[in-house]
């Protein structure tokens, strides 16, 4: 599922998610295109988001844009789904 809102009190969304298994994929492209993720405040917001996701029981896989459709990413997602209860 694309653009999944995972937090009950914030408007945080994962790029892709399997909600029934609490497995998510985040595409980290900002470092390469000058996006907000490389600025200190953007980086800190991302840290808060990922920490809250962990507290809520989510396994978050972070990939670069070029890795999204790679076999190694698919294998990571499969392993996460198999191992994350």
Regions found by a protein language model. Give the residues of each.
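Nucleic-acid endo/exonuclease domains
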Residues: 1-85
């Amino acid at each position: 599922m694309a653009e999944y809102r995972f937090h009950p009190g914030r408007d945080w969304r994962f790029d892709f998610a399997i909600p029934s298994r609490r497995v998510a994929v985040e595409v980290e492209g900002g470092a390469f295109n000058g996006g907000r993720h490389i600025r200190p405040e953007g980086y800190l917001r991302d840290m808060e988001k990922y920490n809250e996701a962990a507290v809520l029981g989510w396994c978050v896989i972070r990939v670069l844009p070029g890795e999204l459709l790679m076999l190694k990413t698919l294998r990571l997602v499969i392993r996460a789904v198999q191992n994350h209860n």
